[in-house]
Amino acid sequence: MAAQKDQQKDAEVEGLSATTLLPKLIPSGAGREWLERRRATIRPWGTFVDQQRFSRPRNVGELCQRLVRNVEYYQSNYVFVFLGLILYCVVTSPMLLVALAVFFGACYILYLRTLQSKLVLFGREVSPAHQYALAGGVSFPFFWLAGAGSAVFWVLGATLVLIGSHAAFHQIEPADGEELQMEPV
């Protein structure tokens, strides 16, 4: 607990507090904890995009080694690149924004309705899971018209290209033990 507060104080000194940067709408729970861990383990963006550290790998072995080590090292940065691409895709597609508004509006109405009373159809109580499935079914035509399927594949493709090319061409720093290893002759 004390170590966590020390890390938070260090981040606040730098002007970045993970708790203030996270939206207040995300409830405390597993999702918020995961996002806080990602935010805490993010690598400096300066080293992430340093142009002097990009070069072509010499062979396939080095390429594979770079891919594995960079994905492991910059995992949190890659998550935020992915989230940024999702945000870009949603903001630049007005129909997708409308479809998301319809879906989240229906979910919010159902949430308010369940606070007041249970929903009963044909003499049977409808569970919240079924209600949200109904909201998804109602908003499905909007997602289909907005081209949500192509947006999903665009985001996945753009993420793979960006992360794959960064991981392949970004030089890895040698680990502490690798610098001093000598091979027998």
UniProtKB/Swiss-Prot annotation:
<keyword id="KW-0963">Cytoplasm</keyword>
<dbReference type="GO" id="GO:0042802">
    <property type="term" value="F:identical protein binding"/>
</dbReference>
<feature type="topological domain" description="Cytoplasmic">
    <location>
        <begin position="166"/>
        <end position="185"/>
    </location>
</feature>
<keyword id="KW-1133">Transmembrane helix</keyword>
<dbReference type="Pfam" id="PF03208">
    <property type="entry name" value="PRA1"/>
</dbReference>
<dbReference type="GO" id="GO:0030674">
    <property type="term" value="F:protein-macromolecule adaptor activity"/>
</dbReference>
<feature type="topological domain" description="Cytoplasmic">
    <location>
        <begin position="113"/>
        <end position="131"/>
    </location>
</feature>
<feature type="transmembrane region" description="Helical">
    <location>
        <begin position="79"/>
        <end position="94"/>
    </location>
</feature>
<feature type="topological domain" description="Cytoplasmic">
    <location>
        <begin position="1"/>
        <end position="78"/>
    </location>
</feature>
<comment type="function">
    <text>General Rab protein regulator required for vesicle formation from the Golgi complex. May control vesicle docking and fusion by mediating the action of Rab GTPases to the SNARE complexes. In addition it inhibits the removal of Rab GTPases from the membrane by GDI1.</text>
</comment>
<dbReference type="GO" id="GO:0045202">
    <property type="term" value="C:synapse"/>
</dbReference>
<comment type="subunit">
    <text>Homodimers. Interacts specifically with both prenylated Rab proteins (including RAB3A and RAB1), and VAMP2 (synaptobrevin-2), in an exclusive way. Interacts with NDRG1. Interacts with free GDI1 in the absence of Rab proteins. Also interacts with PCLO.</text>
</comment>
<dbReference type="GO" id="GO:0005886">
    <property type="term" value="C:plasma membrane"/>
</dbReference>
<dbReference type="GO" id="GO:0008021">
    <property type="term" value="C:synaptic vesicle"/>
</dbReference>
<dbReference type="GO" id="GO:0070064">
    <property type="term" value="F:proline-rich region binding"/>
</dbReference>
<feature type="region of interest" description="Required for interaction with GDI1">
    <location>
        <begin position="165"/>
        <end position="185"/>
    </location>
</feature>
<protein>
    <recommendedName>
        <fullName>Prenylated Rab acceptor protein 1</fullName>
    </recommendedName>
</protein>
<keyword id="KW-0812">Transmembrane</keyword>
<dbReference type="GO" id="GO:0016020">
    <property type="term" value="C:membrane"/>
</dbReference>
<dbReference type="GO" id="GO:0098978">
    <property type="term" value="C:glutamatergic synapse"/>
</dbReference>
<keyword id="KW-0472">Membrane</keyword>
<keyword id="KW-0770">Synapse</keyword>
<feature type="transmembrane region" description="Helical">
    <location>
        <begin position="149"/>
        <end position="165"/>
    </location>
</feature>
<feature type="transmembrane region" description="Helical">
    <location>
        <begin position="95"/>
        <end position="112"/>
    </location>
</feature>
<dbReference type="GO" id="GO:0005794">
    <property type="term" value="C:Golgi apparatus"/>
</dbReference>
<dbReference type="GO" id="GO:0016192">
    <property type="term" value="P:vesicle-mediated transport"/>
</dbReference>
<keyword id="KW-1003">Cell membrane</keyword>
<dbReference type="GO" id="GO:0051020">
    <property type="term" value="F:GTPase binding"/>
</dbReference>
<feature type="region of interest" description="Required for interaction with prenylated RAB3A and VAMP2">
    <location>
        <begin position="175"/>
        <end position="185"/>
    </location>
</feature>
<feature type="region of interest" description="Required for interaction with prenylated RAB3A and VAMP2">
    <location>
        <begin position="30"/>
        <end position="54"/>
    </location>
</feature>
<dbReference type="GO" id="GO:0098793">
    <property type="term" value="C:presynapse"/>
</dbReference>
<feature type="transmembrane region" description="Helical">
    <location>
        <begin position="132"/>
        <end position="148"/>
    </location>
</feature>
<keyword id="KW-0968">Cytoplasmic vesicle</keyword>
<feature type="region of interest" description="Homodimerization">
    <location>
        <begin position="175"/>
        <end position="185"/>
    </location>
</feature>
<comment type="similarity">
    <text>Belongs to the PRA1 family.</text>
</comment>
<dbReference type="InterPro" id="IPR004895">
    <property type="entry name" value="Prenylated_rab_accept_PRA1"/>
</dbReference>
<keyword id="KW-0333">Golgi apparatus</keyword>
